């Protein structure tokens, strides 16, 4: 069995090596000719899976995407061909939620404006939006959720309108899929008019898709309003973001909010489980066996951490400033965006760091944030 796999997908060899011959390929430049003899195709969001790519293949048994979203996959075409498909919903939700939370802590420190006491509006209450809300609520932050689709589906959580978030939230974090048509389309959800209407001193965080915000309009509005603070992990026209926009963001990164080792492993592992199910064989590999030991054994806390100390704990796990600096230095280079994504192998989730502290009742929130070992 020939397994064609994006060369940047981690842990493929230990998971799929026993199932067939693994053929690594460049996902962004993948051609129909390369796919021709594949039995299994494993991709990431940089690969457009459609008739143009697959029409010359009559052997394909499974297509898997190690991503939350599926907007890069023609699901109708796969269904017409009776080709089984699976993605990895929620695989990197924890990573995205922690990224957004860490970014907010970093902004709070940079501008001496504590996160505690602010109101955060989350637009899109799916896996990543929910994970962001979980972090914020663990820390005691008031969260407003906007998701008209989930509200209409009967989701029991309390939702508010986007207008309410615009009026009441100090921070707005975007977590919607990209949809270009329909009543709730999200392309340019934040157009020039909506960007201009942001209340003074709003922090805007985008970890979903670049064209949820009109990037040209964002440049124009930001140049007029220095009070707006931006955290941008996603960009229109990836992998070539508008060079005028990057310097206007407080933190800028190349679509890596979900790129924790745990999240990457989880995505590949979910596809492994699905393929085993399809082949009717036992999935006998373990997710935990894939992850390396964290380089800090444990951190002992003398007292419950304040916000500054919490940021330091977060930086032990992931220092956003490092990726921001690297991105600014490399994004204009040829392939700089993709090279940084490919080589992004260092980030862990809060669960990798064990905390030791006797005063359990005072730090339950640290456990709820995701840190391990608290009070043990």
UniProtKB/Swiss-Prot annotation:
The keyword NAD applies. CDD domains: ErythrP_dh. It is found in: Cytoplasm. It catalyses: 4-phospho-D-erythronate + NAD(+) = (R)-3-hydroxy-2-oxo-4-phosphooxybutanoate + NADH + H(+). Keywords: Cytoplasm, NAD, Oxidoreductase, Pyridoxine biosynthesis. It comes from the Bacteria. Its EC number is 1.1.1.290. NAD(+) binds at residues 147, 233, 258. Pfam families: 2-Hacid_dh, 2-Hacid_dh_C, DUF3410. One of its GO terms (molecular function) is NAD binding. Homodimer. PANTHER family: D-ISOMER SPECIFIC 2-HYDROXYACID DEHYDROGENASE CATALYTIC DOMAIN-CONTAINING PROTEIN-RELATED (PTHR43761:SF1), D-ISOMER SPECIFIC 2-HYDROXYACID DEHYDROGENASE FAMILY PROTEIN (AFU_ORTHOLOGUE AFUA_1G13630) (PTHR43761). Belongs to the D-isomer specific 2-hydroxyacid dehydrogenase family. PdxB subfamily. This is Erythronate-4-phosphate dehydrogenase. The lineage of its organism: Bacteria, Pseudomonadati, Pseudomonadota, Gammaproteobacteria, Alteromonadales.
